[in-house]
Amino acid sequence: MGLAIGWTPGLTALANAQTADGAAATPRIIAAAANPHSVAPARSEPVTDPVADPRAVVTFGKARFTVLAPELIRMEWAADSKFEDHASFVFLNRRLPVPPFEHEVADAGQKLIIKTSALALTYTPGADGRFGPDNLAIEFAVNGKRVDWHPGLVDPENLQGTTRTLDGALGDRTKEPIEPGLVSRSGWAVVDDSTRPLFDSADFRFLHGEKSPWPWVMERPAGERQDWYFFGYGHDYYKALGDYVRVAGRIPLPPRFAFGAWWSRYWAYSDQEIEEIIRGFHENDIPLDVFVIDMDWHPTFSGERGKLDASGHSKGWTGYSWNRLLFPDPDQFLVTLHADGLKTSLNLHPASGIQPWEDRYPEMAKAMGVDPATKQYIPFDITDKRFARNYLDIVHHPLEKQGIDFWWLDWQQEPKTKLPGVTPTWWLNYVHFTDQQREGKRPLLFHRWGGLGNHRYQIGFSGDTVSVWDSLAFQPWFTATAANVGYAYWSHDIGGHAPGAVEPELYTRWVQFGAFSPILRTHTTKNPDSERRIWAYPEPYSSILRSTFQLRYALQPYIYTEARRTYDTGVAFFRPLYYDWPQEDAAYTTKGEYMFGDQMLAAPVTRPVDKATGLATEKVWLPAGEWIEWPTGKHLIGPATVERSFSIEQTPVYLRAGAIVPMQPPMRYTGEKPVDPLIVNVWPLAPGQTSNYEVYEDSGASVEYQRGVFARTPIKATQAGDLLRVEIGPAQGSYPGMLNTRSYQLRLPADWPPVTVTVNGVPVAHAGVTGKGGWSFEGNTLTTVISVARGSVGDRITVEVRRAAGRAARRNELDGFAGAMTRLRGAYDALRQTFPVSDAPDILVDAMQAGDRLGYHPEQAQEEIVRFHKVLSQAQAAAAEIDKDLAQRAKETDTDAQKQHRLDAAARAHRQVNEACQESQSPLASP
């Protein structure tokens, strides 16, 4: 079975592809590549200076205004006229290039006016100067219309941000409110930073070793103060988030392995059971990168259920010592997992502190000034720097040295700490994430959203949702909306958390969504009926699940490139449609769709199929332009809302015309082997169109990506008449472990086969179905596959593909061909269920085999396509006749059960053939 998108560039032929020797190139620092939305400096590590350039500051009485950008102004008022220059939990860096602005004092010194290119601020202090609706106003424009803001103005059009957890959420019914976002259809947002805690230092240049600085929390000075940030970006949401990460810190790039598959389940696994599950992944050809071990890795005292520990929490809820019954030799167990290429994460509930039964208790007690003989527990106090250092150095670091790669901070019960405004969730995220930076690692933390500023410490654990269709339907909107606060990496329990068994169809659709989400992590509660092992599901679901996991891995070069773009721009690659189409009402009201990087629009199926047809029907809104539906190859023209039907193996993903999508060969885990060949998919371009893309690569594990140690490979595709030219490279930049040489596979889906192919001017011959040493044609998806021999990554490769005269203008004849093939195979399978009363008619088999014939003889493509449309019409009539005939026979001979089965099969086949006919009807104008 093909990959579960419905059809996709084939990868199985590359499973044993020869790889380069992986010789490392010498790193050199390079400038960041041009990006229309990039805010990244050309070459630098992250800079934080909370003290603004004095030229950006205007002080007027008890108020101070800092112009951070034309659309972004900080507004402070202090009763004692003492203003704050420390970094806050949200805003770290205020020393930005000073934008042009004017300011004047008017009305005999009673009024301050500040004007930038985007807004005008007026402040008339009055008696005490405290900001209010009567003395402060900002005027700006949204789509040419004047907008006036003043304190206290309610914004009903804020586009929202995210929330701490989806625990217990049933669909969109969340237990905790979703916080406001930084963008709004009203064109403005205000962040009140008045009471947020501060950092005692702005030295976030984390070094490897004990001398590394570690800024710590401090309270705000006493007194009456206001500290606001006004965002007046109109509908330029890209710029709003871009400037936000300039002042609040960038969204970090996770390690590359994080974009692989994660296994997680709340279950008391032994080491043997875990190894058995890993074997199951390998034996069933399912890739895996991360094994998350839930809380039973440590003693949970299940025999003392209901008993509380000294902190008042359930005994065993927190733990830092291995359960030696389940894990007799943790060191060897972790060696085994790492030998399989896996990363390991352990579950923590830190709230209970360090209890006297923990292995590290004696050392921890001494470090905290407690006599271990007293067995007095060590309370959890993460805002105490002494406790935090000991908590990490004594308790966590030894486990990390054993082989634990990152932590899952599952839950933190208390909503507050000893310090006002400091929540345990927010501060734990900071402490654990920056501890990894101090250790010299590229950090990864799995925890919940703690509030604004937590975009710097990801990945997010969304919590325990209910396993129903409504929960799945809510998650695309929820995940995309988090982009509005820079939270780019939510990880959901794929399949839901509770209460128990999940029907195969729902699990399959959830995994399909997961493949096109930031993190693909399956999970469930401690219930024997809750199954997440792919191979335990019946067919066809098991095969579809497998191919969906494989597709996720195939897309890793694309996903990783888009994650780098997230770091550069501050805009999540999984984002709402209104970032790219802010003037379209449908971009705001369409909640089941999102952009998945710059090249793809995803609209995952979140409802069950119709039992009679085997298809799920969805309404999909497509923005302006030409879009290609990946599962079917159908071209659709936007803006439009279209009604589309999808079988269980199809995931609705739409690509821009001319989209360039890099992919990789099959791998058991990330980094199992070099990405060689790099697979380059170029989707059909419009006449005269040029497309560009840059594939981003780095070591995948170090923080040097922040300092210019990476490489980008440019790809350019141009359609000129019937000639397609694709240029790859040369690679720009380098990093440790970078390939010096590489091969490529160029794939051209949904288009006519070539007449001639050249690589760097040298003709390449058609090499039959194998494609070895030349090019081949995959007829069922109309994909030309061109193998490009290994060469230096520093060279430019030019591939020219010429099709028969006039073919580019007749592309509409191919429209939806891949989808028609899928529907015909479905009809064939359905009719075979009616045997021996009936069977698939020859004319249907003839139509279904058109793709195979094209693959064998691409030179006959024109004749075959013309014939296909004629045969398809005949197959439609034949299917209708069989449907009618079986209905009559069922009345005469069958039992009720037999009758219903055959009637359903015939009706399904009839519908599938009708759908095949619809798929092959092009919305593109005929020449």
Q: Language-model features: where?
A:
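Mature N-terminal, pre-catalytic/accessory segment of carbohydrate-active enzymes
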Residues: A17, D21-F83, H103-Y123, D128, ...
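Accessory, solvent-exposed terminal regions and/or long lumenal/extracellular loops of proteins
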Residues: L655-P763, N780-T781, V788-D904, R911
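Catalytic-domain carbohydrate-binding cleft regions of carbohydrate-active enzymes
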Residues: P27-S44, D49, L121, P133-R656, ...
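Sec/Tat signal peptide C-region and signal peptidase I cleavage site
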Residues: L11-N16
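Solvent-exposed beta-strand/loop surfaces of large extracellular or lumenal domains
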Residues: A87-E102, V370, I628-I648, T756-I786
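Bacterial N-terminal signal peptides
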Residues: M1-G10
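N-terminal accessory segment at the very beginning of proteins
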Residues: Q18-V247, R256, E273, I278-R279, ...
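A surface-exposed beta-strand-loop module
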Residues: Q110-I113, S117-A120, T770-T798, G806
